[in-house]
Amino acid sequence: MLILGRRKGESILIGDDIEITIVDIQGDYIRMGIQAPREVSIVRKEIKEQIREENIKAAEKPEGLPALLEEMKKFI
């Protein structure tokens, strides 16, 4: 893991097309601005983990499958 120190208003670059700028610092809270191409997915780690957990739970409960299949038939 690379650890960098940055001050408010300073940035780091990831590759040629992703820029992360420190927008504000208040105590332990840091606000960052991220500029990246639209095709780059940017999500908070805790949100991605929550979605993954919900997907696992949904896959374990097949009782909702018939209703899902009926909804999908509308688009075929």
UniProtKB/Swiss-Prot annotation:
Protein's cellular compartments:
Cytoplasm
MF (Gene Ontology): mRNA 5'-UTR binding
Extract the Pfam families matched here.
CsrA
Give the range the annotation lists for the signal sequence: none
UniProt KW keywords: Bacterial flagellum biogenesis, Cytoplasm, Repressor, RNA-binding, Translation regulation
Where are the coiled-coil regions? none
Which domain of life, per UniProt? Bacteria
What GO CC terms are in its UniProt record? cytosol
Note the PANTHER family from the entry.
Answer: CARBON STORAGE REGULATOR
Which family does this protein fall into?
Belongs to the CsrA/RsmA family.
Its biological purpose is as follows: A translational regulator that binds mRNA to regulate translation initiation and/or mRNA stability. Usually binds in the 5'-UTR at or near the Shine-Dalgarno sequence preventing ribosome-binding, thus repressing translation. Its main target seems to be the major flagellin gene, while its function is anatagonized by FliW.
Instruction: State how it assembles.
Output: Homodimer; the beta-strands of each monomer intercalate to form a hydrophobic core, while the alpha-helices form wings that extend away from the core.
Q: What is this protein called?
A: Translational regulator CsrA
Organism encoding this protein: Syntrophomonas wolfei subsp. wolfei (strain DSM 2245B / Goettingen)
Could you tell me the gene encoding this protein?
A: csrA
